[in-house]
From Swiss-Prot:
InterPro entries: FAD/NAD-bd_sf, MnmG-rel, MnmG-rel_CS, MnmG_N, TrmFO. GO terms for cellular component: cytosol. It catalyses: uridine(54) in tRNA + (6R)-5,10-methylene-5,6,7,8-tetrahydrofolate + NADH + H(+) = 5-methyluridine(54) in tRNA + (6S)-5,6,7,8-tetrahydrofolate + NAD(+); uridine(54) in tRNA + (6R)-5,10-methylene-5,6,7,8-tetrahydrofolate + NADPH + H(+) = 5-methyluridine(54) in tRNA + (6S)-5,6,7,8-tetrahydrofolate + NADP(+). It holds the Pfam family GIDA. Its EC number is 2.1.1.74. This is Methylenetetrahydrofolate--tRNA-(uracil-5-)-methyltransferase TrmFO. Keywords: Cytoplasm, FAD, Flavoprotein, Methyltransferase, NAD, NADP, Transferase, tRNA processing. GO terms for biological process: tRNA methylation; tRNA wobble uridine modification. The lineage of its organism: Bacteria, Bacillati, Bacillota, Bacilli, Lactobacillales. It comes from the Bacteria. Gene3D superfamilies: FAD/NAD(P)-binding domain. One of its GO terms (molecular function) is tRNA (uracil(54)-C5)-methyltransferase activity, 5,10-methylenetetrahydrofolate-dependent. Its cofactor is FAD. Belongs to the MnmG family. TrmFO subfamily. The gene is trmFO.
Amino acid sequence: MTEKVTVIGAGLAGSEAAWQLAKRGIKVDLYEMRPKKMTPAHESGNFAELVCTNSMRSNQLSNAVGLLKEEMRQMDSLIMQAADACQVPAGGALAVDRELFSRYVTDKLTSLPEVIIHDEEITDLPSEGITVIATGPLTSDSLAEKIQDFEGAESLHFFDAAAPIIAADSIDMDIVYKKSRYDRGEAAYLNCPMTKEEYDRFANALVHAETAEIHGFENSEVFEGCMPIEVMAARGAKTLLFGPLKPVGLENPKDGKTPYAVVQLRQDNAAASMYNIVGFQTHLKYGEQKRVFQMIPGLENARFVRYGKMHRNTYMASPEVLKASYEAKKRPGLFFAGQMTGVEGYVESAGSGLVAGINAAREALGQETVEFPVTTALGSMAHYITTTDAKHFQPMNASFALIPGLEGKKIRNKRERHEKISERGLADLAAFKAEKLDD
C-alpha cells in the first residue's frame, strides 16, 4: 500500500506540493493553522494567500522568473494554473486578482478526493512518515523552535514589507495616465507624473517620516527585493529615480514628455477597484503613509484600502540541512519547501513546493528522489540553496546568474542570450521529464 504524505502549510509551496502529490495518486493530509491561528501578515484562511504584492513579475523568457513560470507550466503547476486563470492587466508582467487566486487554489485542493484538509496548528516535527514542511517565513514560534533544534543551527531572518493598496475611485484620473513601460503589452499601469520640485518635496518628507517600531528591525536586515521605500530613499536623494520612481519609457501622452519621476499604480483585482503602489513597500506609521503618499500627484485624496506593513521572515541554513531534492540530509522522507528554504518570491516558493512534492511522491511510491537539471530555473535554485557558502547564505530570487552560461560563441545581446538560456532550459526540462518522471 502506498504511504500517505503529510504536508504542513497551505501557502504557495505547500499547496503546490499537495497538488503534485495528489495528481500522482498519493493520499495527502494537508494541515493549515489559519484561520484558527493567524500570522502577522495574512488576512484570511484561504490557501496560497498573497500577502505582499499581487505581481508574479515578468512573463518574458528573457527574464529568469519568466523561464521559471514556463517550466512550472510544463510540470502542470497548480499555482501557475491559478495565476493564468486569475490574471489582471500588467503589461509584460503576470499579476493576479489576489482574492480570486487564493480562492481558486483553495477550491481545487478541497475538491480533490486524495487531499484531506486539517485546519489545525502543528507544533512539532512529525517523528515518522513522509512529510513536507512548507510553513513559510511566518512559521509559528513553537514549530520554528523544533525546526531550529532539528537544524542544529540558529535560523536566519530578514524583514519583508508590503505596499499600500488604494481605492481606484479615489485616484484623480485627470492627473494620472495609463501606460506600460516602453509600451510593453497593453497599457496596464496608472502613472502619477512628478516634476523635480514635487519629487524633492516628496523624497524629503519620506526620509523624515516616522516609522513604526518593529522589534529587532535594523535596516541592514531587509531583503533587497522588498526594501521599504523610506529605507531606499535614505540612501541618496536620487536613489528612487533609479528604482520604483524611474521615469524611463513612461512618456506622458498628454504632452509627449518624460516626467522627472513617475509613481506607478498596478491593478490589484479583476474589478479594477483597487490599485497597489508599485515598489512602495513600507513600515511607516499608518498616519504618515497617508500624509506622505497623498503628496503624490493624483493621489491627493487617495483612500487606503490597506496600509503597507512589515514583518519578520525566518529562513533555514539550507546549505547545511537540505539536498537539492529539498529532502533533509539527516532524515530521509522529511522535505522542506517555500521561502523558509531561502528561495525568495511567490513563484520561486511555489517552484520549490513543486520539486519537493514530486520527490515526496517518489518517496511514497518507493522510487528514488530526483534533482532537476541545473540548466533549468527550478534546478538552479535548488542547487544554489544547497551548495552556496552557508556563512554567507542569503535568500535568492530566480536569476540567470544561477544558471550555467551557454557554450560556444558568446552572444553579446543580453536579451537574446537570456532567451537562448531559457530555450535550452526548457529543452533540458522536457528531456529530464521524459527520462526521469514520465514513468
